[in-house]
């Protein structure tokens, strides 16, 4: 019989995704057939699954941890925010429409069927399924029709372990408050809790464990320290961009403007791992550094809206001066579209302005269209003469004079554009920098020897390290029962 466990958080960003990945790798290392599952995810960091649809990149990483091919059924409902009030809805890997918050609330009962169908598919033949919740089950205003947390857990009869983040403070109140506010039906699903991101002497929290037990009756299944290896894993949420620090004194400064609807920002993780790169995330209100050698404009879920914001920050003028000084620019997906002369949206797909002038650094224009490209791709960089693998997730078609100088060839077709002076490059291909050969060639073009480290191998090693750290601190009896053959 397939065993199931669900990690739900006392809030967002408590570390559920990493813990699920770590448990998946721990189970896989012990010979179990383990699968990750997340009923509903909200993220603009999407991946193309091995069966050709869109899922959250956290579930893609968890599949890697489980050593199984990724599937659309691992994340049957993916919400991709396009504005403060509306999201694109992806169901079992395919776009199913758009909805605002209240509209989506009405849709949730209909989506439960797809969630349960996917859960059954994932569970078939598995020894263990590790499920990840979303946000917090204590948001009882969202409980009616819920498919992300307790609504799913009660329907699928999956036991729940709560995760509390002690690093942000107030973890006892978060756990006890969650117990107090949950209805009895939901409270019965909780079997215990984990404390995550603990720093220092764990025995200092013994009284805290006793207090939580006194108020809730829940056992503690482990106090997890701050997992250093997790820093080597791709990040899921853009909130981490606020926590990144600069690495001064390195050979190349790479500046990345933080867009309001930034998407697939984990494209940049391999650059952050390079010892000779100072990766700087430029936040609203700050200029693009004048000493940057390279500016990377990442993907966006709202190209026109982010382009308007880009200009409002004065980054367009910063970028022009950067190029005049001899600096280089790479635009990926939405960033590529912004670099052109014009972006139009005649059908109102993005829900905002219908046309806007681009940054004018590439002689191309983009028109948004409803057909969405979603695929894994093998490519050849014409600029650096290396083979690489990546993926495409985009709307719109880009054409113009600079497309006559494509930046890459993807599966024998031209993609992207290169400016006449070679300083500005755009492409729809995500995952460029994950290729060690491409990253090494790029750095070499700046006079830097780099890219020697195998990035994919380093991610895999980090998953092993996270699994080993969890095995050392989790309650042995609970873990043995979870991982029994």
UniProtKB/Swiss-Prot annotation:
Q: Which UniProt keywords apply?
A: Cobalamin biosynthesis, Glutamine amidotransferase
Q: Which GO terms describe its molecular function?
A: ABC-type vitamin B12 transporter activity; catalytic activity
Q: Which Pfam families match?
A: CbiA, GATase_3
Catalytic residues (positions): 333 (nucleophile), 430
Listed InterPro entries: Class_I_gatase-like (IPR029062), CobQ/CobB/MinD/ParA_Nub-bd_dom (IPR002586), CobQ_GATase1 (IPR033949), CobQ_N (IPR047045), CobQ_synth (IPR004459), GATase_3 (IPR011698), P-loop_NTPase (IPR027417)
As for family, the record states: Belongs to the CobB/CobQ family. CobQ subfamily.
Query: This chain belongs to which protein, by name?
Result: Cobyric acid synthase
């Amino acid at each position: 019989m397939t065993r199931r466990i669900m990690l739900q958080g006392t809030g967002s960003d408590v570390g559920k995704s990493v813990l699920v990945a770590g448990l998946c790798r721990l189970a896989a290392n012990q010979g179990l057939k383990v699968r990750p599952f997340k009923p509903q995810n909200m993220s603009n960091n999407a991946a193309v699954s091995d069966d050709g649809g869109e899922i959250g990149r956290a579930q893609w990483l968890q599949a890697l941890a489980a050593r199984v091919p990724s599937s659309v059924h691992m994340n049957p409902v993916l919400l991709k925010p396009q504005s403060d009030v509306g999201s694109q809805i992806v169901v079992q890997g395919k776009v199913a429409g758009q909805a605002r918050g209240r509209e989506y609330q009405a849709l949730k009962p209909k989506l439960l069927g797809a969630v349960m169908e996917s859960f059954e598919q994932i569970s078939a033949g598995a020894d263990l399924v590790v499920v990840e919740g979303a946000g917090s089950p204590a948001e009882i205003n969202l409980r009616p029709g819920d498919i992300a947390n307790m609504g799913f857990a009660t329907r699928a009869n999956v036991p729940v372990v709560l995760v509390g983040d002690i690093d942000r403070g107030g973890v006892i109140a978060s756990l006890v408050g969650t117990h107090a506010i949950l209805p009895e039906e939901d409270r019965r699903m909780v079997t215990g809790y984990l404390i995550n991101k603990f720093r220092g002497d764990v025995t200092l929290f013994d009284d805290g464990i006793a207090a939580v037990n006194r108020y809730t009756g829940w056992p503690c299944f482990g106090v997890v320290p701050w997992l250093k290896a997790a820093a080597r894993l791709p990040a899921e949420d853009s909130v981490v961009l606020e926590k990144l620090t600069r690495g001064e004194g390195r050979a190349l400064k790479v500046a990345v403007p933080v867009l309001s609807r930034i998407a697939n920002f984990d494209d940049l993780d391999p650059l952050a791992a390079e010892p000779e790169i100072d990766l700087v995330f430029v936040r609203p209100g700050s200029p693009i550094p004048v000493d940057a050698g390279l500016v990377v404009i990442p993907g966006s879920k709202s190209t026109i809206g982010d382009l308007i914001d880009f200009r409002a920050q004065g980054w367009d003028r910063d970028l022009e001066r950067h190029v005049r000084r001899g600096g280089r620019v790479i635009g990926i997906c939405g960033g590529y579209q912004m670099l052109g002369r014009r972006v139009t949206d005649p059908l109102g797909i993005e829900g905002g302005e219908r046309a806007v002038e681009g940054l004018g650094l590439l002689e191309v224009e983009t028109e948004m269209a409803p057909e969405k490209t979603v695929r894994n791709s093998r490519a050849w960089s014409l600029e650096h003469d290396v083979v690489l693998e990546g993926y495409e997730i985009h709307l719109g078609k880009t054409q113009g004079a600079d497309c006559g100088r494509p930046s890459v060839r993807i599966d024998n077709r031209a993609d992207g554009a290169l400016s006449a002076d070679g300083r500005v490059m755009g492409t729809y291909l995500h995952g460029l920098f994950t290729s060690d050969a491409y990253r090494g060639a790029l750095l070499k073009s700046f006079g830097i020897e780099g890219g020697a480290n195998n990035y994919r191998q380093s991610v895999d090693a980090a998953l092993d390290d996270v699994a080993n750290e969890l095995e050392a601190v989790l309650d042995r009896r609970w873990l043995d029962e979870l991982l029994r053959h």
